[in-house]
Amino acid sequence: MSPEDPQETQPLLRSPGARAPGGRRVFLATFAAALGPLSFGFALGYSSPAIPSLRRTAPPALRLGDTAASWFGAVVTLGAAAGGVLGGWLLDRAGRKLSLLLCTVPFVTGFAVITAARDVWMLLGGRLLTGLACGVASLVAPVYISEIAYPAVRGLLGSCVQLMVVTGILLAYVAGWVLEWRWLAVLGCVPPTLMLLLMCYMPETPRFLLTQHQYQEAMAALRFLWGSEEGWEEPPVGAEHQGFQLAMLRRPGVHKPLIIGICLMVFQQLSGVNAIMFYANTIFEEAKFKDSSLASVTVGIIQVLFTAVAALIMDRAGRKLLLALSGVIMVFSMSAFGTYFKLTQSGPSNSSHVGLLVPISAEPADVHLGLAWLAVGSMCLFIAGFAVGWGPIPWLLMSEIFPLHIKGVATGVCVLTNWFMAFLVTKEFNSIMEILRPYGAFWLTAAFCILSVLFTLTFVPETKGRTLEQITAHFEGR
């Protein structure tokens, strides 16, 4: 079939009668690409141990006040939003592999700037650079992994993206116990450097190579990743070079997955995960933990364990079931969390956001301690529920549902939406709590979780066991 053929299909990489692939190098390539999300997670988790270290040991020019500390944590999301746009542009022009290689530059440069910082502006500049790299990695890594994986393991390998993110966060928390902020930034250079070295030996995805009409290179990549090219057919790729045009939004195969992808990112951030993470230390303090920093590590361990569980069962249980189950768990946990605040806080709504988590009820100490444990239990349940579904699956589905020729633009829009919502929710959550009181704010997030369950059951298709071509055909009504 010639490149001018208007037929719109993605590369059909396996004929119906062919044997299932058995190559193991696909797991090595996944690990190499997933070092990007590991770096991304480390950059996100870096601020939690670094801010106390900067306030404790840094010279006067580097001391962070409340405003600077707030921006030190939040500026990553702004850089990541820009990185999402940049990643979407790079994805279709530079390719998946080169985009991953390029994102190592701002990762290493950003941490190097932080290490050499002489004033607060250098700290913020370094964080902005690492945020830019986070945006690119969060977009490109899921796409690369989904395009090299065969259907039987695509859920497992795709879930490794979120697993590596939470592992990176946990690594930053644990390392922060023994390393001060400069050496912690030096450690942050290690994962992207390792990714740079490993990705040099990994192939470009066969799908991208086929869109460039590099048939021999695509077959070589298949042999490297899957062990054999037996049964592979030369695909029709004519329409893949059209690129994205606004007129395409009229086609159901384009606007349906785009709407679903955007909504998944919006609901992920409206679940309240950032609010829970922000208040983890305070909740553990009220439960009488001697070392409140233990909260961060405990939360990180729960995230890693349950994200690993999700990865192991993803290709058996399916995406839709896990998303719905995750949403139900978050509804109950957020409702219980709001109930905790309702029982421990009363009186007129005239407190500032600084004191929102200070109990002002007249309950006896032992009663309040019991309620604090209700909060700890609710928080841990929420984190487990989020990790099983709404943590990894939106990123996995983002990499699965878009046609190949719009993947760069569509994933860029989704990543931009996710990071913009993360910034908006983090920045405005205190204002919402001042208006609705803490219990009202958390009950509102429970309502959003209910909507996410209804959305999942109504609109999200099951992609378990389907090829990417079958998923595209589903949206096109074929």
Swiss-Prot record:
Inhibited by cytochalasin B. Highly expressed in adult and pubertal testis, but not prepubertal testis. Moderate expression in hypothalamus, cerebellum, brainstem, hippocampus, and adrenal gland. Lower amounts present in most other tissues. It is a multi-pass membrane protein. The chain crosses the membrane at residues 26-46, 71-91, 97-117, 128-148, 157-177, 183-203, 258-278, 294-314, 321-341, 369-389, 406-426, 440-460. InterPro entries: MFS_dom, MFS_sugar_transport-like, MFS_trans_sf, MFS_Trehalose_Transporter, Sugar/inositol_transpt, Sugar_transporter_CS. Pfam families: Sugar_tr. SUPFAM superfamilies: MFS general substrate transporter (SSF103473). GO terms for molecular function: D-glucose binding; D-glucose transmembrane transporter activity; dehydroascorbic acid transmembrane transporter activity; fructose transmembrane transporter activity. It is found in: Cell membrane; Cytoplasmic vesicle membrane. PROSITE patterns: MFS, SUGAR_TRANSPORT_1, SUGAR_TRANSPORT_2. Belongs to the major facilitator superfamily. Sugar transporter (TC 2.A.1.1) family. Glucose transporter subfamily. Interacts with AP2B1. Insulin-regulated facilitative hexose transporter that mediates the transport of glucose and fructose. Facilitates hepatic influx of dietary trehalose, which in turn inhibits glucose and fructose influx triggering a starvation signal and hepatic autophagy through activation of AMPK and ULK1. Also able to mediate the transport of dehydroascorbate. This is Solute carrier family 2, facilitated glucose transporter member 8. It comes from Rattus norvegicus. The gene is Slc2a8.
